[in-house]
Amino acid sequence: MYYGFDVGGTKIEFGAFNEQLERVATERVATPTDDYAKLVETIAGLVHKYDAQFGVEGTVGLGIPGMEDADNGCVLTVNVPAAKGKPLRADLETKLGRAVKVENDANCFALSEAWDDELKEAASVMGLILGTGFGGGLVYEGKVFSGRNHVAGEIGHMRLPIDAWFHLGEKAPLLGCGCGNKGCMDNYLSGRGFELLYEHYYGEKKKAIDIITAQKEGESKAVEHVERFMELLAICFANIFTANDPHVVVLGGGLSNYDLIYEEMPKRVPKHLLSVAKCPKIVKAKHGDSGGVRGAAFLNIK
């Protein structure tokens, strides 16, 4: 039995999956955001509860909005203050008497999609999230690749490539990022970035959904903005694909529901790739909000 936990800022979602990778149990509880001991006890309590229910010791995987320090195993996170700087994995392993795996939630999203029936034969899958932020995860041969420092796939904190700056023109905004740097892709390619760029060029705030609606209706500023954004996305995608060369790319997050992306990227990306390279297949995520739990559980698939 595979147990997965999606540990968020307000709730913890638990899921149990059988050997056929079918979900057989679900539970949601509030996240003890400021009480570390209670956080550990809450997770361990759910594990013990479902061990008893299923009569087996399930494997345990956690997806968190952050990552582990590669050297000391302590958690680096903002959204779950109780876990910040704490050895969450080690403490859970001591309490449960079994191995526990912890991964960034974007990596869990990518792993969930990589184990979908239609994609599980793909040698490599890249998950990209176009949501409040822009991030991703890498899966090779069914396993998350997180790198030496657990930051592989943190593409939101790569800076815009030079051709993207040329595309945005002399008035391109140099946006600051929460990581301390400027010009990170996170602030340009996310749903939030889609809105920030519109505000920068046209001097008015609009929600992404309203901009998209206006574009579909032919409103000139929205049409121009979407054209600019699609080319920006293609340039950045091409740089990312050149570095990682994935077989399949899965898009998640709110902006991934914009169907025009799937029409435009296969046409626009190739001209920014090496001449020998082909644009990978780009598809919409199938598992939505359940992806974090699925991916966390599937961290333990051998």
Swiss-Prot record:
E.C. code: 2.7.1.59
GO molecular function, one term: N-acetylglucosamine kinase activity
Gene3D superfamilies: 3.30.420.40
Biological or metabolic pathway of the protein: Cell wall biogenesis; peptidoglycan recycling
Pfam families xrefs: ROK (PF00480)
Key words, A-Z: ATP-binding, Carbohydrate metabolism, Kinase, Metal-binding, Nucleotide-binding, Transferase, Zinc
Positions bound to Zn(2+): 157, 177, 179, 184
GO biological process terms held by the UniProt record: N-acetylglucosamine metabolic process; peptidoglycan turnover
Catalytic activity as recorded in UniProt: N-acetyl-D-glucosamine + ATP = N-acetyl-D-glucosamine 6-phosphate + ADP + H(+)
Entry keyword Transcription regulation: no
Family as reported in the entry's similarity comment: Belongs to the ROK (NagC/XylR) family. NagK subfamily.
Task of the protein: Catalyzes the phosphorylation of N-acetyl-D-glucosamine (GlcNAc) derived from cell-wall degradation, yielding GlcNAc-6-P.
Protein name: N-acetyl-D-glucosamine kinase
The organism's taxonomic lineage, starting at the top: Bacteria, Pseudomonadati, Pseudomonadota, Gammaproteobacteria, Vibrionales
Gene: nagK
